[in-house]
């Protein structure tokens, strides 16, 4: 019995490991894996179909073909286990060893491993410091390489051609050693002394100054050190033994008709073996050198093709002209091992079918067809049948189920009760794409889905299919019930708002039910309560819309959370009173006492969840749905062609527009306007006409005139079906109704320009042929766009998930005081996002003080929930510093306080939550709703861009921030600073509006003054940039020489003359070095100093500046000295939508980025070159000045002698995120990326919480470059994981040593994914070959920290419910305990053994 137990133990053994290391395999290692050498290229015998001995499928090397049976048939059965047959040499064991036993081929000549040769940068090339071309010429036998120079003048590693080699031989004889082929490279690698080489390189590194050399040296040092530390030997990159894959992983299967299907690898191996055997024979025969050389080259090519076909030269093709799939192709790409089999597997116990509506289901139920349920729950049914004694064996149970006996259905009912199933709809874009439901057995073959979960699945019933999965184990069922049940996923993880929101019919039903109508039947009655209202409605005595008074009892929570009743008479309608019956206690009546649209219903559910919690909300949602369906049916809302009412004014408006267009056409023909102006004007006219038509149409649809009780006419909101659908938010929008009943309007050509004749017809009137033809482009483009968008959006999601997959909440509080300042998002005159929406669910980083006092309003480390936010709003706080994942100090992962509220649950986040994946899904899921296009700014839009004044909308007081200004002669303020902001503060101290004020703007009101709504507070000339004097005095020209640096121009119309400064390109040789400037002097001719400095007021003028003053005139501060014409920005395309989001997350540099000041100091201009200006910034403290060359065509925002701060904009343009990080720090770049991404999503009306974007930014910032190594082991200029630097520095500081200094790096998401510490994760993402090559050479360890790595090695993930398992494992490892192995008792063992033997004896068990 003991050995039986041993045998079973061997089978249940689980491998415990903490990390996976990858390294180069030495020849001895390859031989130790191998079970024998493959000597022949044969596969199987064509007659017997048995594997050939010593061939690629040899049973002696790889194991038996049949379980427990040797090849010749001498030994069969279990009792001979482990015997090696003396006749055929095959060990008697299970067949599955053919999946794990490897063989090997002894190569007659060494060959280079193509990955280390050709995958850039070439590792062999870097190690030997030889160019790749030279190494290839040596390897493929074109030239010689010197291995030992000896006493000759030949250098080691010198390349010799055939002729040079022969000459050298004649000259030196045997003094030197030169070879060709892989042997040569192997000899060079063998003779390297890595440590000595390292020392030498480090010395060199200290001596050199050139940047390129330093980079190259650092690369080599890193590679050499990696070799030294990992214990890899460089010569192992040259193969002398080739491992052979186990045969069952490269199968040869007989097809019917006597042909065979084989894996491509077999062909590739055959080539290698053939060439290798031929080479051996040639060497034994001592064949001529040239033949041997050719054979060696062919062997090298064969091995290359086996390892990575097509990497060098042309890919080897099979019989059908398609390239053969090599080992490298097996693991990379979507069809490779990683993505096809390790990360995505097919699932047993699953089925799929079409979905239909289940309007009578409860929220936690789904309808499952009986047929499907029977198939999916088979094992449970068999078990129950056997348990009840209804079937003696599993086989009998199987028969019963196949016959579908009556008792089977009863058992099925029992099995299914309380056993949730998972429903999934592809594409699963976020975690709500898989939810758990309790199955309800139904007839038919379609799965029934609850209508309210359609939004989460993005499902509709036009033929969508869904998959069903059965959680088998108890843990899985528990997880499904507790975490994945649809009732537990009411809120969306992306924004924390309800996702179980009624739509379409339900919304229409509720809207119809809560509308009121003038003079409806039963108006003016007073009812005792909702019950009576329903009775009257049902008996036809009152209309649903009748305005009545009803006695309503409301329940409100008091301070202790007890419900208190309050009864009063309310003015309402019958329908609203009936709806009140389903509203849970604790909500105010006011929430149903309005016409309920989709937004109102969503708000109602949200309020219910926040006040009453989960269970009442779920019940309420269900009730809303049933009621909505019922009343939608009763409403009888239908759409007829007469519902699309065309306004009478339409004809008139269109003829007016046509008249205007004709007029402009005449002006154009008489030459008063240019072609471009005419086009823009025509388009403006038609756009305006379209708006007028649609306004007339909406006014017409919106209201109808009725007779009230007193017999007078009264207007009321219309009951037109189309209008009701749009108004309630059930379906359709104003823009769509406009096309039905207004006019279709302007259409675009395929090149994006707008066609100037619009479609004046609408769909009700019908389009004529020309109009229909014009419409086709837009319609088709829409379809093509959608297909592209889906692919792009999916790829963006994949990159986001990959970069963030290992970010998990790992501790409660990291204790940091860092955080980011949150202010409301204000653009121009309106608040885009109020502060409460931004800080809700975040944790405060500092105490929030009551404005104007030192009282603490909210203490530090408070989770801001709804009540706290109300408090902040009451006290009109407009900036709060909150914790953020970007500033979290946790080493691997983040802490719960820095993340804040779990949006989908409404409380602070739990440890182990996979926030990275949630963030990636939340950003990626709405990707398909974003647009794909870059917007061309056409006519109307580009003119609006040149603003020239600020007009406030509300009344309040003005607040200016970072402002420098002077008062001009008329007493107005003139701005002389660059990034001034003007805010409008209301009487509560809240910021209502915010504007940027440019340099040179004249303010009508000063700081702190009161303004009325609609008042203009600042204006400026948008087309020129002024030069403004800060002092008063007299103008003195310097270097302004007519004809050399300036030229005088006279305006024909006004007769005024002005001076124009010449660009340096237009000046004569004498004027090149002159610097035209205006100096301000006092009456005595002395320099006037700029206030607060000791610098004379002197204003240098750039080229093209226009001066309208004469020498010596008197001026006062705030006057304009000169104007610099601004070239209008022209029509720059705005990249919008998905491409913009991708650009931001990939941290791509914009084409012409803004130029920012690298240091703070005084600006001056140095010597110019042909196309560039030299900008010099001299720091005030006298340290080294900073110089930068700027192209001449860039417009500068600064003048000579002006002071700039580090990070200020010197030349306008889109800012590059890397510059923002370098000059303004981590928080600034976070704010920039978050705001830019949010702008794109906000435009589409998609809400995403900021913290998701911050999570991705944290991952983009996870690398740092070492600036100064201090006492650490890092290299200068090396890029290291930020957490590694932090840990190393903490250790160094604890020992009183100097830590390393570093600068944070911003990586794009693709780069960041590939630069992750885990090579398994990186390899499964992209560029598999490169990642694995790099990892192998460095001998990397993968600590299996992320989710992906653990999925790949087949473990629970260290997040969610797997988090505890991993924590426990870590604890055990630390304590040195043995892991809890599955225990096997003797009884179990003998039982399972008996079963095993039965299986072996019983023959075929599967009739």
From Swiss-Prot:
<dbReference type="Pfam" id="PF00623">
    <property type="entry name" value="RNA_pol_Rpb1_2"/>
</dbReference>
<dbReference type="GO" id="GO:2000142">
    <property type="term" value="P:regulation of DNA-templated transcription initiation"/>
</dbReference>
<keyword id="KW-0862">Zinc</keyword>
<keyword id="KW-0046">Antibiotic resistance</keyword>
<comment type="subunit">
    <text>The RNAP catalytic core consists of 2 alpha, 1 beta, 1 beta' and 1 omega subunit. When a sigma factor is associated with the core the holoenzyme is formed, which can initiate transcription. The rRNA transcription and antitermination complex (rrnTAC) consists of RNAP, NusA, NusB, NusE (rpsJ), NusG, SubB, ribosomal protein S4, DNA and precursor rRNA; S4 is more flexible than other subunits.</text>
</comment>
<feature type="binding site">
    <location>
        <position position="888"/>
    </location>
    <ligand>
        <name>Zn(2+) 2</name>
    </ligand>
</feature>
<keyword id="KW-0479">Metal-binding</keyword>
<dbReference type="GO" id="GO:0006352">
    <property type="term" value="P:DNA-templated transcription initiation"/>
</dbReference>
<dbReference type="InterPro" id="IPR006592">
    <property type="entry name" value="RNA_pol_N"/>
</dbReference>
<dbReference type="InterPro" id="IPR007066">
    <property type="entry name" value="RNA_pol_Rpb1_3"/>
</dbReference>
<dbReference type="GO" id="GO:0090605">
    <property type="term" value="P:submerged biofilm formation"/>
</dbReference>
<dbReference type="GO" id="GO:0006879">
    <property type="term" value="P:intracellular iron ion homeostasis"/>
</dbReference>
<dbReference type="GO" id="GO:0005829">
    <property type="term" value="C:cytosol"/>
</dbReference>
<dbReference type="InterPro" id="IPR045867">
    <property type="entry name" value="DNA-dir_RpoC_beta_prime"/>
</dbReference>
<dbReference type="InterPro" id="IPR007080">
    <property type="entry name" value="RNA_pol_Rpb1_1"/>
</dbReference>
<feature type="binding site">
    <location>
        <position position="464"/>
    </location>
    <ligand>
        <name>Mg(2+)</name>
    </ligand>
</feature>
<dbReference type="Pfam" id="PF04998">
    <property type="entry name" value="RNA_pol_Rpb1_5"/>
</dbReference>
<keyword id="KW-0240">DNA-directed RNA polymerase</keyword>
<dbReference type="Pfam" id="PF04983">
    <property type="entry name" value="RNA_pol_Rpb1_3"/>
</dbReference>
<dbReference type="GO" id="GO:0000287">
    <property type="term" value="F:magnesium ion binding"/>
</dbReference>
<dbReference type="GO" id="GO:0016020">
    <property type="term" value="C:membrane"/>
</dbReference>
<dbReference type="GO" id="GO:0031564">
    <property type="term" value="P:transcription antitermination"/>
</dbReference>
<feature type="binding site">
    <location>
        <position position="460"/>
    </location>
    <ligand>
        <name>Mg(2+)</name>
    </ligand>
</feature>
<dbReference type="GO" id="GO:0009408">
    <property type="term" value="P:response to heat"/>
</dbReference>
<dbReference type="GO" id="GO:0032784">
    <property type="term" value="P:regulation of DNA-templated transcription elongation"/>
</dbReference>
<dbReference type="InterPro" id="IPR038120">
    <property type="entry name" value="Rpb1_funnel_sf"/>
</dbReference>
<feature type="binding site">
    <location>
        <position position="88"/>
    </location>
    <ligand>
        <name>Zn(2+) 1</name>
    </ligand>
</feature>
<feature type="modified residue" description="N6-acetyllysine">
    <location>
        <position position="983"/>
    </location>
</feature>
<feature type="binding site">
    <location>
        <position position="72"/>
    </location>
    <ligand>
        <name>Zn(2+) 1</name>
    </ligand>
</feature>
<keyword id="KW-0548">Nucleotidyltransferase</keyword>
<dbReference type="Pfam" id="PF04997">
    <property type="entry name" value="RNA_pol_Rpb1_1"/>
</dbReference>
<dbReference type="GO" id="GO:0046677">
    <property type="term" value="P:response to antibiotic"/>
</dbReference>
<dbReference type="InterPro" id="IPR044893">
    <property type="entry name" value="RNA_pol_Rpb1_clamp_domain"/>
</dbReference>
<dbReference type="InterPro" id="IPR000722">
    <property type="entry name" value="RNA_pol_asu"/>
</dbReference>
<feature type="binding site">
    <location>
        <position position="85"/>
    </location>
    <ligand>
        <name>Zn(2+) 1</name>
    </ligand>
</feature>
<dbReference type="GO" id="GO:0003899">
    <property type="term" value="F:DNA-directed RNA polymerase activity"/>
</dbReference>
<dbReference type="GO" id="GO:0042128">
    <property type="term" value="P:nitrate assimilation"/>
</dbReference>
<feature type="binding site">
    <location>
        <position position="898"/>
    </location>
    <ligand>
        <name>Zn(2+) 2</name>
    </ligand>
</feature>
<dbReference type="InterPro" id="IPR012754">
    <property type="entry name" value="DNA-dir_RpoC_beta_prime_bact"/>
</dbReference>
<dbReference type="GO" id="GO:0036460">
    <property type="term" value="P:cellular response to cell envelope stress"/>
</dbReference>
<dbReference type="GO" id="GO:0071973">
    <property type="term" value="P:bacterial-type flagellum-dependent cell motility"/>
</dbReference>
<feature type="binding site">
    <location>
        <position position="70"/>
    </location>
    <ligand>
        <name>Zn(2+) 1</name>
    </ligand>
</feature>
């Amino acid at each position: 019995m003991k050995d039986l137990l041993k045998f079973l133990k061997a089978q249940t053994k689980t491998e415990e490991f903490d990390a996976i290391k990858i390294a180069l395999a030495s020849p001895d290692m390859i031989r130790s894996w191998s079970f024998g050498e493959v000597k022949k290229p044969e596969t199987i015998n064509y007659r017997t179909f048995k594997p050939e001995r010593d061939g690629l499928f040899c049973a002696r090397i790889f194991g038996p073909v049949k379980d427990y049976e040797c090849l010749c048939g001498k030994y069969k059965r279990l009792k001979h286990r482990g015997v090696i047959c003396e006749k055929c040499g095959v060990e008697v064991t299970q067949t599955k060893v053919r999946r794990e036993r490897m063989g090997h081929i002894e190569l007659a000549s060494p060959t280079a491993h193509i990955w280390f040769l050709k995958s850039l940068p070439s590792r062999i090339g870097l190690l030997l410091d030889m160019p790749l071309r030279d190494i290839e010429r040596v390897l493929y036998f074109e030239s010689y390489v010197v291995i030992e120079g000896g006493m000759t003048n030949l250098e080691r590693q010198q390349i010799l051609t055939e002729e040079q080699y022969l000459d050298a031989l004649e000259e030196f004889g045997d003094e030197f050693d030169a070879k060709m082929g892989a042997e040569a490279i192997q000899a060079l690698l063998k003779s390297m002394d890595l440590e000595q080489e390292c020392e030498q390189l480090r010395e060199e590194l200290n001596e050199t100054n050139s940047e390129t050399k330093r980079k190259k040296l650092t690369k080599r040092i890193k590679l050499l050190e990696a070799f030294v530390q990992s214990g890899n030997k460089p010569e192992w990159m040259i193969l002398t033994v080739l491992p052979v894959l186990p045969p069952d992983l490269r199968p040869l299967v007989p097809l019917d008709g006597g042909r065979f299907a084989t894996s491509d690898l077999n062909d590739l191996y055959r080539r290698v073996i053939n060439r290798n055997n031929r080479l051996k024979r040639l060497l034994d025969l001592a064949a001529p050198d040239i033949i041997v050389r050719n054979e060696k080259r062919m062997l090298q090519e064969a091995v290359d093709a086996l390892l990575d076909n097509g990497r060098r030269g042309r890919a080897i093709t099979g019989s059908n002209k398609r390239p053969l799939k090599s080992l490298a192709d097996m693991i990379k790409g979507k069809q490779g091992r990683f993505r096809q089999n390790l990360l995505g597997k097919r699932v047993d116990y699953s089925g799929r079918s079409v979905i239909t509506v289940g309007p009578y289901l409860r929220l936690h139920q789904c309808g499952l067809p009986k047929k499907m349920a029977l198939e999916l729950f088979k094992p449970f049914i068999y078990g129950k049948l056997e348990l009840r004694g209804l079937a003696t064996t599993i086989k009998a149970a199987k028969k019963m189920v196949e016959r579908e006996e009556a008792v089977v259905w009863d058992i099925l009912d029992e099995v299914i009760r309380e056993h949730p199933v998972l429903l999934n709809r592809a594409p699963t874009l976020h975690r709500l794409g898989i939810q758990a439901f309790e199955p309800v057995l139904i007839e038919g073959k379609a799965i029934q889905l609850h209508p309210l979960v359609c939004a989460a699945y993005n499902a509709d019933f036009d033929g969508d299919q869904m998959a069903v999965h059965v959680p088998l184990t108890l843990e899985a069922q528990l997880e499904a019930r507790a975490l994945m049940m649809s009732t537990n996923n009411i809120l969306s993880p992306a924004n924390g708002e309800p996702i179980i929101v009624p739509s379409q019919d339900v919304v229409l039903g509720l809207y119809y039910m809560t509308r009121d109508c003038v003079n409806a039947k039963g108006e003016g009655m007073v009812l005792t309560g909702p019950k009576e209202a329903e009775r009257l409605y049902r008996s036809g005595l009152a209309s649903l819309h009748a305005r009545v008074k009803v006695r309503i009892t409301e329940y409100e929570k008091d301070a202790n959370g007890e419900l208190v009743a309050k009864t009063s008479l309310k003015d309402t309608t019958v329908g609203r009173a009936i709806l009140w019956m389903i509203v849970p206690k604790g909500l105010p009546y006011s929430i149903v006492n309005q016409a309920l649209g989709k937004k109102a219903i969503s708000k109602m559910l949200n309020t219910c969840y926040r006040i009453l919690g989960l269970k009442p909300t779920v019940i309420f949602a269900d009730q809303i749905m049933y009621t909505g369906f019922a009343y939608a049916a009763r409403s009888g809302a239908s759409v007829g062609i007469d519902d699309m009412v065309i306004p009478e004014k339409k004809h008139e408006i269109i003829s007016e527009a046509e008249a205007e267009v004709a007029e402009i056409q005449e002006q154009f023909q008489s030459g008063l306007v240019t072609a471009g102006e005419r086009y823009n004007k025509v388009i403006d006219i038609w756009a305006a006409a379209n708006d007028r038509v649609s306004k007339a149409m909406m006014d017409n649809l919106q209201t109808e005139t009725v007779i009230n009780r007193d017999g007078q006419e009264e207007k009321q909101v219309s009951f037109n079906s189309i209008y009701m659908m749009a108004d309630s938010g059930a379906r359709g929008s104003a823009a769509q109704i406009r096309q039905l009943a207004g006019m279709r309007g302007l259409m675009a050509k395929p090149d994006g320009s707008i066609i100037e004749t619009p479609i004046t017809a609408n769909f009700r009137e019908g389009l004529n042929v020309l109009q229909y033809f014009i419409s086709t482009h837009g319609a088709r483009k829409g379809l093509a766009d959608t297909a592209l968008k889906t692919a792009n959006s999916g790829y963006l999601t994949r990159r986001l998930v990959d970069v963030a997959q290992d970010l998990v909440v790992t501790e409660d509080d990291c204790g940091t005081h860092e955080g980011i300042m949150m202010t409301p998002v204000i653009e121009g005159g309106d608040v885009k996002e109020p502060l409460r929406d931004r800080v809700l669910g975040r944790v405060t980083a500092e105490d929030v003080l009551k404005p104007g006092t030192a009282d603490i309003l909210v203490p530090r480390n408070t989770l801001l929930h709804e009540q706290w936010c109300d408090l902040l709003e009451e006290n009109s706080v407009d900036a709060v510093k909150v914790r953020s994942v970007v500033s979290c100090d946790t080493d691997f992962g983040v802490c719960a306080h820095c993340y804040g509220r779990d949006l989908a649950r409404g409380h602070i986040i739990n440890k182990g939550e996979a926030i990275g994946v949630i963030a990636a899904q939340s950003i990626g899921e709405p990707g398909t709703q974003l647009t794909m296009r870059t917007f061309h700014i056409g006519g109307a839009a580009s003119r609006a861009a040149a603003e020239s004044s600020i007009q406030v909308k509300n009344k309040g007081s003005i607040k200016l921030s970072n402002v420098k200004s002077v008062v001009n002669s008329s007493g107005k303020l003139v701005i002389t600073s660059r990034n001034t902001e003007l805010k409008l503060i209301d009487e509560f101290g809240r910021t209502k509006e915010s504007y940027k004020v440019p340099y040179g703007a004249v303010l009508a009101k000063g700081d702190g003054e009161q303004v009325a709504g609609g008042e203009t507070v600042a204006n400026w000339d948008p087309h020129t940039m002024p030069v403004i004097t800060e002092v008063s005095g007299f103008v003195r020209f310097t270097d302004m020489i007519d004809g050399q640096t300036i030229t005088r121009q006279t305006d024909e119309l006004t007769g005024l003359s002005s001076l124009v400064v010449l660009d340096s390109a237009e000046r004569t040789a004498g004027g090149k070095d002159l610097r035209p400037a205006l100096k301000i002097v006092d009456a005595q001719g002395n320099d006037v100093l700029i206030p607060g400095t000791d610098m004379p007021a002197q204003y240098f003028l750039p080229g093209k500046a226009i001066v309208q003053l004469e020498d010596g005139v008197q001026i006062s501060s705030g006057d304009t000295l000169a104007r610099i014409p601004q070239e209008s920005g022209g029509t720059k395309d705005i990249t919008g939508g998905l491409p913009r989001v991708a650009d931001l997350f990939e941290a791509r540099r914009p084409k012409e980025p803004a130029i920012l000041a690298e240091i703070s100091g005084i600006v001056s201009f140095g010597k110019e070159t042909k196309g560039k200006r030299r900008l010099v910034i001299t720091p005030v403290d006298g340290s080294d000045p900073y110089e930068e060359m700027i192209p001449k065509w860039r417009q500068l925002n600064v003048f000579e002698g002006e002071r700039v701060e580090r990070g200020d904009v010197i030349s306008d343009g889109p800012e590059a995120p890397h510059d923002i990080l370098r000059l303004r720090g981590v928080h600034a770049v976070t704010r920039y990326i978050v705001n830019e991404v949010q702008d794109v999503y906000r435009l589409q009306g998609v809400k995403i919480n900021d913290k998701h974007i911050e999570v991705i930014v944290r991952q983009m910032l996870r690398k740092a470059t070492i600036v100064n190594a201090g006492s650490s082991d890092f290299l200068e200029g090396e890029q290291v994981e930020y957490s590694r630097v932090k840990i190393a520095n903490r250790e160094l500081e604890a020992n009183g040593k100097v830590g390393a200094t570093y600068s944070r790096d911003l990586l794009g998401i693709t780069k960041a994914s590939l630069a992750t510490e885990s090579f398994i994760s990186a390899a499964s993402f992209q560029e598999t070959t490169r990642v694995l090559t790099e990892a192998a050479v460095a001998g990397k360890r993968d600590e299996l920290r992320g989710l992906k790595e653990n999925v790949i090695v087949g473990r629970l993930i260290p997040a969610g419910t797997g988090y505890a398992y991993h924590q426990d494992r870590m604890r055990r490892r630390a304590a040195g305990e043995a892991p809890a192995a599955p225990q096997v008792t003797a009884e179990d063992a003998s039982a399972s053994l008996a079963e095993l033997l039965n299986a072996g004896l019983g023959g075929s068990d599967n009739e």
